[in-house]
Amino acid sequence: MKTFIGIMIPFLGTALGAACVFFMKKNLGNLVQRALAGFAAGVMVAASIWSLLIPAIEQSEGMGKLSFLPAFIGFWVGVLFLLLLDRLIPHLHVGSNQAEGPKSRLGRTTMMVLAVTLHNIPEGMAVGVMYAGFLAGNAQITAASALVLSLGIAIQNFPEGAIISMPLRAEGESKGKAFLGGVLSGVVEPIGAVRTILAAQLVIPALPYFLSFAAGAMLYVVVEELIPEMSQGKHSNIGTVFFAAGFSVMMTLDVALG
């Protein structure tokens, strides 16, 4: 039951964020959107470092001076994996008029949902890897540390849910369809987590690689999507301030509770 709750918490964060479309009459202002993107980016960077990369290095201490190697390799594989998906799947980032990936006849709404869905994949995998390690009895991964990562991702999923549902509403979709689009963008997370847990026999022996893989993929999302979003438009420090806030929240959660 703990595992089920843990893998569903991030999805709940997305759904709650998407539900903002029912309570907010206007589209997200530019400053609000930049603040939300900055906060989400801060949470993801902190989670990648404290919950994924550092544990990956610690679990490779037996390799001596080469203990960094699994984290280095996994990190780069994660970055390249997301880069490949970006090239193969047509998608449209919020606030952009230029679609990425191969040419497609898909509508703007579908491609906007695909963009967020694509970048939610590593988050689901990260949660799955943590719970796979916990269920396998890994001494360095506790129920608390796995739950902290789930909570951290849920916190950053809340603004992400709003960031996708509100623009969909502004595009002319009904509130129900805009909410559904936001929710669907998060479905991939519990699915990815479950698939990773089911593949535990493959994951556990290479746990440092999988932890750093998730970190690399998440940091790719931060640099490729969230940093441009928090920096777009007229210069403002709002995105940077909220990045620091998100980073601090996730760091505190991980150190205090994990």
Predicted regions and their residues:
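Intrinsically disordered, metal-sensing/regulatory segments
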Residues: M1-G258
